[in-house]
């Protein structure tokens, strides 16, 4: 019989079993607040590890991007096909203040728009708002039959497509460059830009289902807490002003006697 260690006999581990720790014990919940351009400001909650040493919780939350359905923000199920991206800009107490960071369509909505016998026309343009945000806007539209048309198809000619695309770019640039980001987001919700494009291109070729399908923020200005508070509607000139206590209250407090003293 060979003398040596029997490898089958398991050796006891040092320290024994480790206690199962709850991963949420060292984390805190924060409320996500949307800009006041949307009807519902309470988006939801997010988790972050508590402040430990040099790791500050609020710094870990900044620049987080949240994707929210516009139907939840507006309380309207008809807007469920739009996805709004919000980026955390600042943390105040347990509230995470966000700002608009982009918009997109759901895949099923885009696929439902594409059909036979019509021409798809797309355009995109880089624009700069009055508050120095640089955005890239993508537009999509489809041709439709003219009034009293018997022909099944409604294809546009190449020259007409170029004219329509030129109009799309022109309207998107004019609409975005004449307002700030907050006002521009307010235009995206009711699709007022899409309706204007439909009206402007009706003389070239009638269009239907014209949407600003995607918006990307390419460049943002330097962070300004004052502008962020204006976007959230919580900004006022009386922030940090010391309030004097009414004289009547102080007099009443002085006259009160303790019973049984």
UniProtKB/Swiss-Prot annotation:
The gene is cyc07. Residues 1-18 have a biased composition (Basic residues). The lineage of its organism: Eukaryota, Viridiplantae, Streptophyta, Embryophyta, Tracheophyta. GO terms for molecular function: structural constituent of ribosome. It comes from Daucus carota (Wild carrot). Component of the small ribosomal subunit. Mature ribosomes consist of a small (40S) and a large (60S) subunit. The 40S subunit contains about 33 different proteins and 1 molecule of RNA (18S). The 60S subunit contains about 49 different proteins and 3 molecules of RNA (25S, 5.8S and 5S). InterPro entries: Ribosomal_eS1, Ribosomal_eS1_CS, Ribosomal_eS1_euk. The keyword Cytoplasm applies. PANTHER family: 40S RIBOSOMAL PROTEIN S3A. It comes from the Eukaryota. Keywords: Cytoplasm, Ribonucleoprotein, Ribosomal protein. This is Small ribosomal subunit protein eS1. One of its GO terms (biological process) is translation. SMART domains: Ribosomal_S3Ae. Pfam families: Ribosomal_S3Ae (PF01015). Belongs to the eukaryotic ribosomal protein eS1 family.
């Amino acid at each position: 019989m060979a003398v040596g260690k029997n490898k089958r006999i398991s050796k006891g581990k040092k320290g024994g079993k480790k206690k199962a720790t709850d991963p949420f014990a060292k984390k805190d919940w924060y409320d996500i607040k949307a800009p006041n351009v949307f009807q519902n400001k309470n988006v939801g909650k997010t988790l972050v590890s508590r402040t430990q040493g040099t790791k500050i919780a609020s710094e870990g939350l900044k620049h987080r991007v949240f994707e929210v359905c516009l139907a939840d923000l507006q309380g309207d199920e008809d807007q469920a096909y739009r996805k709004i991206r919000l980026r955390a800009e600042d943390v105040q107490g347990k509230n995470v203040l966000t700002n608009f960071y982009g918009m997109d369509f759901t895949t099923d909505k885009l696929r439902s728009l594409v059909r036979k016998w019509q021409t798809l026309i797309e355009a995109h343009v880089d624009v700069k708002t009055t508050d120095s945000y640089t955005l890239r806007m993508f537009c999509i539209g489809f041709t439709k039959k003219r009034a009293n048309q018997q022909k099944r198809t409604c294809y546009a000619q190449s020259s007409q497509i170029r004219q329509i695309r030129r109009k799309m770019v022109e309207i998107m640039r004019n609409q975005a460059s004449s307002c700030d980001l907050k006002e521009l987001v307010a235009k995206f919700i009711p699709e007022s830009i899409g309706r204007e494009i439909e009206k402007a291109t009706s003389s070239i070729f009638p269009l239907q289902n014209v949407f600003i399908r995607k918006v990307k923020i390419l460049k943002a200005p330097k962070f300004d807490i004052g502008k962020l508070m204006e976007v959230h509607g919580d900004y006022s000139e009386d922030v940090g002003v010391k309030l004097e206590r009414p004289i009547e209250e102080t007099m009443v407090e002085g006259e009160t006697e303790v019973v049984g003293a």
